[in-house]
């Protein structure tokens, strides 16, 4: 056993706790270059998000989508994501692919993003070339475009959970924190580049004339960036399949051994058990002791048991999910209506006037400036994610979490009360603070919770382990699906508020109020590990 564990390229990483079957294992320190490569997925994802934000409304309008169907487009994707995120997250915890647990899901969702972009940016052009009947052409163009938007949104929202779980699987605790900061950094860079390319008038450039329309130009760039970024990401750090843990290790029955999860690990809080093939031999021996029992456990994991695990999650996980929901509700309330706010309130344009009127042209100018504001948000998100590494040593995760919500709440409040072009653009930098906070701090807290639970198991080896089917994939997915729930709340509630108040100012004020409520929640209810 000892000689096998000492083979080249395979080292044992033990905790400082007492030796025993509950020893944690720590993957090696990852080079910064590998963490940057891992973060390229966030760059590609956010680039494509920015392209969608800039072009999806013009695309939907150009194909003739009735306004009555808008709600279906924006509701279907988050509803599907909210229902399926924990299911797929748990399935990835138990995936036995030879390529690892997370990468097969990331690759599949990346392909779905690419197909979705191809459908909503090129679908109408392809349909026009294939169908001559005007009525059938309209129906098919709308259908293909809607399917593309829903497919892209679903995959892009979904993929964040597996990417985070992949990072947690293969990195040490310190590298997880560094990796999350790099994720936020490249998220901002990707969004900024996407908004900048979307602001270029491609119709008057050679590339635009060569490819046909600006929609095809943006698909070319999106497909290129997404393919390159995800290829680099998937090759960044290797994953060991779960079956490799038990390879070449004889089974050893122990009557008092606690039940194992389907992947041969003590499931709840399993973030530090076996990662990237670096195996504690005593732990691996227990993990391999009864393969048939593990397979039966995996097959017994039903949707009912999964929902039970979600309902019975520990209170500190539940509070973290609620705080994440509050934060994303505030953030999306502002971001989804920000360009319209700039056009109508700051520039005092009218989107409902004739398209050749002065009021409509002023509104369009406001929308363009609003896009530059979103670009400022992305740039400052990247900058703040870099400074987070310095700030966390002074104010901790609680200070970072509270500060992000507070600055966003105050900034959006000032924008709503005093709408001015220059002050609004300056305050857009605070949107970036909130964005970086939402992408890093909650997931840092997840790693802290898992690390704390691992230490508790080491200190009490005779205690009963948690028998739930929870794992880090499910925890990341549950946290991520709060984004979909926030989209559902925003899509269903803000339209009613705007119609009732008669102005989009209510959107910005609502975002400010929700963020300030979130300040109180993260300070009073979210638990922080010392």
UniProtKB/Swiss-Prot annotation:
Disulfide bonds: none annotated. SUPFAM superfamilies: MFS general substrate transporter. It is linked to Albinism, oculocutaneous, 4: A disorder of pigmentation characterized by reduced biosynthesis of melanin in the skin, hair and eyes. Patients show reduced or lacking pigmentation associated with classic albinism ocular abnormalities, including decreased visual acuity, macular hypoplasia, optic dysplasia, atypical choroidal vessels, and nystagmus. Belongs to the glycoside-pentoside-hexuronide (GPH) cation symporter transporter (TC 2.A.2) family. Residues 1-46, 90-110, 160-184, 238-318, 388-398, 447-477, 526-530 are cytoplasmic. The keyword Transmembrane applies. It comes from Homo sapiens. Changing residue 435 to Y: In OCA4; uncertain significance. Changing residue 374 to F: Protective factor against melanoma; correlated with dark hair, skin and eye color in Caucasians; decreased protein stability; no effect on subcellular location. One of its GO terms (biological process) is sucrose transport. It comes from the Eukaryota. It catalyses: sucrose(out) + H(+)(out) = sucrose(in) + H(+)(in); D-glucose(out) + H(+)(out) = D-glucose(in) + H(+)(in). Its main location: membrane. This is Membrane-associated transporter protein. Interacts with TYRP1. Glycans are attached at residue 356. It is found in: Melanosome membrane.
């Amino acid at each position: 056993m000892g000689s096998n564990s000492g083979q080249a390229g395979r080292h044992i990483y033990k905790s400082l706790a007492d030796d025993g079957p509950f020893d944690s294992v720590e993957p090696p320190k990852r080079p910064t270059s590998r963490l940057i490569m891992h973060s390229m997925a966030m760059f590609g994802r956010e680039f494509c998000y920015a392209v969608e934000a800039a072009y999806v409304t013009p695309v939907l309008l150009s194909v003739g989508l009735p306004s009555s169907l808008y709600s279906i487009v924006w509701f279907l994707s988050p509803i599907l994501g909210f229902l399926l995120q924990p299911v797929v997250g748990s399935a990835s915890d138990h995936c036995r692919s030879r390529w690892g647990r997370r990468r097969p899901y990331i690759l599949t969702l990346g392909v779905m993003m690419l197909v979705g972009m191809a459908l909503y940016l090129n679908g109408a052009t392809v349909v026009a070339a294939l169908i001559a009947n005007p009525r059938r052409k309209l129906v098919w163009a709308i259908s293909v475009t809607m399917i593309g938007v829903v497919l892209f949104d679903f995959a892009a929202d979904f993929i964040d959970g597996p990417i985070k779980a992949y990072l947690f699987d293969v990195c040490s605790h310190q590298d997880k924190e560094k990796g999350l900061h790099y994720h936020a950094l490249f998220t901002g860079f990707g969004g900024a580049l996407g908004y900048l390319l979307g602001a270029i008038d491609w119709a008057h450039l050679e590339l635009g004339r060569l490819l046909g329309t600006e929609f095809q130009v943006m698909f070319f760039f999106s497909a290129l960036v997404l393919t390159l970024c995800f290829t680099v990401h998937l090759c960044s750090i290797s994953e060991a399949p779960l079956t490799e843990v038990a390879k070449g290790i004889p089974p050893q029955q122990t009557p008092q051994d606690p039940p194992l999860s389907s992947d041969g690990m003590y499931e709840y809080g399993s973030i530090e058990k076996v990662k990237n093939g670096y195996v504690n031999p005593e732990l691996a021996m227990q993990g391999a002791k009864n393969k048939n029992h593990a397979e039966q456990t995996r097959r017994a994991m039903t949707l009912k048991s999964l929902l039970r695990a979600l309902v019975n999650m520990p209170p500190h996980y539940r509070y973290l999910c609620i705080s994440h929901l509050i934060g994303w509700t505030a953030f999306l309330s502002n971001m989804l209506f920000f360009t319209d706010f700039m056009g109508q309130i700051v520039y005092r344009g009218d989107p409902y006037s004739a398209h050749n009127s002065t009021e409509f042209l002023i509104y369009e100018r406001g929308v363009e400036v609003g896009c530059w504001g979103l670009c400022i948000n992305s740039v400052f998100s990247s900058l703040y994610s870099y400074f987070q590494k310095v700030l966390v040593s002074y104010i901790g995760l609680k200070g970072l979490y509270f500060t992000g919500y507070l600055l966003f709440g105050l900034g959006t409040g000032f924008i709503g009360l005093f709408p001015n072009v220059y002050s609004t653009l300056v305050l857009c930098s605070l949107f970036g603070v909130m964005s970086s906070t939402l992408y890093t701090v909650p997931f840092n807290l997840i790693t802290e919770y898992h690390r704390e639970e691992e230490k508790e198991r080491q200190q009490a080896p005779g205690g009963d382990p948690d028998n739930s089917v929870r794992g880090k994939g499910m925890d990341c997915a549950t946290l991520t699906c709060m984004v979909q729930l926030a989209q559902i709340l925003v899509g269903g509630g803000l339209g009613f508020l705007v119609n009732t108040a008669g102005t989009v100012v209510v959107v910005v004020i609502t975002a400010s109020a929700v963020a300030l409520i979130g300040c109180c929640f993260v300070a009073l209810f979210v638990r922080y590990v010392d």
